[in-house]
């Protein structure tokens, strides 16, 4: 396991504490929630991995910090507010990016990797926001609980991540913006010790963060003061 320096460790404690406290207060009837968790610019992807969340790691690893990061963050604020209106979406503002989570039960049937009609509506709503804000990358992750074999769960999480990615492509999201990853049962949010916890672990996560064009534009704006 890689050792974290003091700055990384401090950021990890702050981030995980903020996210945990925010998530504990979620109301299942809410359409969405935005959780702020400023990360700082120099932390790196290792912090997210140490926290057991690679989507978080992708966002932190892409951070640039300083005035440039603040400009990017403000642009992400507006997108996150819109995304939080999508029913079933858990939306977290993390540093200079956005982490969106849908429980798999919201998107797929049991042991299935075909988006149901309601799920298609939700992902179309997400795609509409992403299309209005084209200067971002989108990482799509598939996760499962520990029911079934690890190999089955890994394959299922792969099919689900790719199903969402393909659907976004069909909504005119450029393929150059999309990246998929899948982890099966290896990255649970909570312990798989109850049906409600297992439902949380069966999920698709999105990490949305600035591309090079947005970073350069933010640098120019920051230089103007």
Locations of regions flagged by a protein language model:
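Bacterial N-terminal signal peptides that target proteins for export
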Residues: 2-10
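C-terminal motif of bacterial Sec signal peptides marking the signal peptidase cleavage site
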Residues: 18-22
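Short, low-complexity, glycine-enriched hydrophobic/amphipathic alpha-helices that associate
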Residues: 24-81
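Extracytoplasmic/secreted proteins, especially bacterial periplasmic and envelope-associated proteins
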Residues: 33-38, 42, 63, 78, ...
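Structured segments of extracytoplasmic/periplasmic soluble domains
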Residues: 70, 74, 86-89, 94, ...
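Amphipathic, membrane-active segments
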Residues: 75-106
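Periplasmic peptidoglycan-binding/anchoring modules of Gram-negative envelope and division proteins
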Residues: 107-142, 169, 206-208, 213-225
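Periplasmic OmpA-like peptidoglycan-binding domain that tethers envelope proteins to the cell wall
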Residues: 143-217
